Amino acid sequence: MSEQNMSIAIDRHHRGMTLDSEQTAIVVKNWNLYYGSKQALHNITMKLPQNRVTAFIGPSGCGKSTLLRCFNRMNDLIDIVSVEGEMLLHGENMYAKEMDVAALRRRVGMVFQKPNPFPKSIYENVCYGLRLQGINDKNVLDETVEWALKGAGLWEEAKDRLDENALGLSGGQQQRLCIARAIAIKPEVLLLDEPTSALDPISTLAIEELIFELKKDFTILIVTHNMQQAARVSDYTAFMYMGDLIEYTDTDSLFTNPQVKRTEDYISGRYG
């Protein structure tokens, strides 16, 4: 990473913060995940701060996306997955037997690597989640669609074409639409799984600037293979390797003064 980019990244972060001084959104305690008999996550313990951006970095196969999918129980969809440990969202056990998983996924929204708009109008894409909740009042839907598209930085480009098929949008616009769809139901946490890896540099910049704004209203967890992106957009960064959480601290410290040699080796490009 160039010194100029690192300086820009540091300037954008909230100075003087530490994990201990932050309000906590999610607590992870002794978290283990298995695919059958193969253990993929090893004893993960961490606190994820509220209204901050936390990035997960590490080489392919390190477990960062697997961990991300634990936060809204997407791994439940894989038959051979089993988990151990505790995961709390604002004090509630996310894996309690009585937890309504559908309700949890409304509280913890997710945007995937490849834009996946529905083959519906832009308007219907954004209000899809509201309709699933039985909300059909046109005034409510109209207000929410405008709010979500503005929040996703897409309103000016889409306001005169809300009835057009969302598949006619560019890749970058489609990804911002997916973000609008995710925030329309006002989740507490937003998960982003490599949200710009399929986008061009201009669209990537738009998404990164959007992430910086969205943390005012949402707790954001982002998986990225791009260390420069992690440095630019996140307040905290977790480095993972082979299913282990190696180092987790504020982003400035991790990139400028890593405390673990394996972290230093990774961010300096010695492996990964």
From Swiss-Prot:
Compartments in which it is found: Cell inner membrane
GO cellular component, one term: plasma membrane
Keyword Nucleotide-binding set for record: yes
GO BP: phosphate ion transmembrane transport
Cross-referenced SMART domains: AAA
Keyword Membrane (UniProt): yes
UniProt cross-references to Pfam families, sorted A to Z: ABC_tran (PF00005)
Domain ABC transporter stretches: 26-267
Keywords: ATP-binding, Cell inner membrane, Cell membrane, Membrane, Nucleotide-binding, Phosphate transport, Translocase, Transport
PROSITE patterns assigned: ABC_TRANSPORTER_1, ABC_TRANSPORTER_2, PSTB
Residues that coordinate or bind ATP: G58, P59, S60, G61, C62, G63, K64, S65
Membrane topology, as annotated: Peripheral membrane protein
Swiss-Prot/TrEMBL catalytic activity: phosphate(out) + ATP + H2O = ADP + 2 phosphate(in) + H(+)
InterPro entries in alphabetical order: AAA+_ATPase (IPR003593), ABC_transporter-like_ATP-bd (IPR003439), ABC_transporter-like_CS (IPR017871), P-loop_NTPase (IPR027417), PstB-like (IPR005670)
Gene3D superfamilies xrefs: P-loop containing nucleotide triphosphate hydrolases (3.40.50.300)
EC number: 7.3.2.1
Subunit structure: The complex is composed of two ATP-binding proteins (PstB), two transmembrane proteins (PstC and PstA) and a solute-binding protein (PstS).
Family: Belongs to the ABC transporter superfamily. Phosphate importer (TC 3.A.1.7) family.
Described function: Part of the ABC transporter complex PstSACB involved in phosphate import. Responsible for energy coupling to the transport system.
PANTHER family: ABC TRANSPORTER I FAMILY MEMBER 17, IRON EXPORT ATP-BINDING PROTEIN FETA-RELATED
Name the UniProt record assigns to this protein: Phosphate import ATP-binding protein PstB
Organism: Hydrogenovibrio crunogenus (strain DSM 25203 / XCL-2)
